[in-house]
Design a protein with these regions (language model features):
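Active-site C-terminal subdomain of aminotransferase-like
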Residues: 154-259, 264-266
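PLP-dependent enzyme catalytic core of the Aspartate aminotransferase-like
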Residues: 12, 283-301
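Short acidic (Asp/Glu) and glycine-rich catalytic loops that position anionic groups and cofactors
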Residues: 45-47, 93, 146-149, 201-208, ...
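Hydrophobic alpha-helical scaffolding
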Residues: 27, 51-58, 100-104, 125-126, ...
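Conserved N-terminal alpha-helix of the aminotransferase class I/II PLP-enzyme fold
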Residues: 1-33
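Conserved PLP-binding catalytic core of the aspartate aminotransferase-like
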Residues: 257-281, 296-299
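Conserved PLP-enzyme active-site core in the AAT-like
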Residues: 32-194
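Glycine-rich ThDP/TPP pyrophosphate-binding loop and its adjacent helix/strand module
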Residues: 67, 72-74, 79-83, 267, ...
């Protein structure tokens, strides 16, 4: 019961952050969670095989999506914020995925994407940063059907890339199609409240080849770490942490401008993008299109 209660706390955290009513007890990582969201939307569609993906999703996530899509005959179509007026390209789309903030650290208004998804009856999926969700409008309130992401920022070290628990939340409409474990509240034989794994008829140990997913596990340890991180800090503490990160970004932007460096002025949360001189000086930094990106967190000094 203690283990289930900890995971139930984690699920509650995810629903409060995303504004979506149903969340599972975690998945393996952000990339596979995005792929599971794609499969959910694909299985929910009728005779459509195109999945629209924000061109600025993280590259590792895009590679997982492409790998998972290929054997199913799904076409991944990358779309740009500036070319989404080409409505004729979206007739065969069953789902749309947006990253907030995106691969360049930009946090843009997704309403244009959401309008297109509504016109073509696509499922709307958001990959979100949970710490950013502390300050921004929950994606569920924006109109997204599914939200996925990584909980690494909630008290879990980077660990050379992993492991990190992923989250998966959705509207009530899809609760019987969501992948992974779900902890639910029930009553025991004496009528007392008790926790148990719920809606297990979705899973392959019961449904076998007709299961909603062949993901039958969770990153329970990492999910519990993230859940207790949130419980320790509380809502007010998380808000202070997220606000501090945002202020660090603003401070770094101001310092770079003062040094005469051209800074990307797009809205964002924790990442500063600027014209790079660091590569020429021999620094080992992320470098693309003549720009360097620096991402900050609560450990920044």
């Amino acid at each position: 019961q203690g283990r289930l209660e900890a995971l139930f706390n984690y699920q509650t955290l995810i629903t409060e952050l995303t504004g979506l009513p149903v969340a599972n007890a975690s998945l393996l990582d952000e990339g596979t969670a995005a792929a599971e969201a794609m499969i959910l939307s694909y299985n929910n569609s009728k005779n459509k095989n195109t999945f629209l993906v924000d061109i600025e999703v993280f590259p590792q996530t895009l590679e997982v999506l492409q790998t998972r899509a290929k054997p199913l005959g799904i076409e991944i179509k990358l779309i740009d914020w500036y070319t989404i007026t080409e409505l004729e390209d979206f007739d065969d789309a069953f789902g749309l995925l947006v990253q907030l903030p995106n691969n360049k650290g930009r946090l843009r208004d997704p309403n244009a994407f959401l309008r297109i998804a509504d016109v073509y009856k696509c499922m709307k999926i958001a990959i979100v940063d949970p710490m950013c969700q502390v300050l921004m409008q929950p994606v569920g309130e924006m109109g997204f059907d599914v939200a996925v992401g990584s909980m690494q920022r909630f008290g879990v070290p980077m660990g050379f890339g992993g492991p990190h628990a992923a989250f998966f939340a959705c509207t009530d409409k899809y609760k019987r199609k969501i992948p992974g474990r779900i902890v639910g509240q029930s009553l025991d034989s004496q009528g007392n409240k008790a926790l148990r794994l719920a809606l297990q008829t979705r899973e392959q140990h019961i449904r076998r080849d007709k299961a909603t997913s062949n993901i039958c596990t969770a990153q329970a340890l990492l999910a519990n770490m993230a859940g207790f991180y949130a419980a320790y800090h509380g809502a007010e503490g998380l808000n202070k942490i997220a606000t501090r990160i945002l202020k660090y970004r603003q401070t770094l932007q101001k310092a770079l401008r003062w040094c005469g460096i051209e800074v990307d002025e797009s809205e964002g949360f924790d990442t500063v993008r600027f014209k790079s001189f660091l590569v020429l000086e021999g620094f080992n930094v992320r470098y693309e299109d003549g720009h360097t990106l620096i991402t900050l967190d609560e450990c920044t000094t």
